[in-house]
Amino acid sequence: MEGWEVTVSHVDYPPGRVGAVHHHAGFVLAYVLEGAIITKVSGQGEEKTYNVGQMFYEQPGATHEVSKNASQTQPAKLLAMIFAKKGSTLTMPGRAQ
C-alpha cells in the first residue's frame, strides 16, 4: 500500500496497569504474548478479555476506551501492529473526534 507503513510495538502491562483512553490514526492489530488484556473499543460492544495467542482489532478513529491488565499480580504483554499513512501521529490521547 503506497504511502502507508506498519509500526510494530511491544507493549508491557505491569500487574494492575490501566491504560489511558486513546485512539489511533490507522488500523491496529494487537496480539497477546503473555497474560491477559481487558479491552473495549468503541463500536465493538462490551469489555472483552483476550488471552495469550488471541488478537483484537481497532478500526481507524475508534476510541480505545479500556486497555488494562486483567491481573493484579502477573504482567501482560502484547504486540501492537499499527497500519497508518506515513508521517501520521500513531497514538493520540483522549476520544476520537
Labelled PLM ranges:
Residues 1-21:
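A short glycine-rich, His/Asp/Glu-containing loop-to-beta-strand
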Residues 87-97:
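Short, low-complexity, Pro/Ser/Thr/Gly-rich segments in the mature regions of secreted, periplasmic
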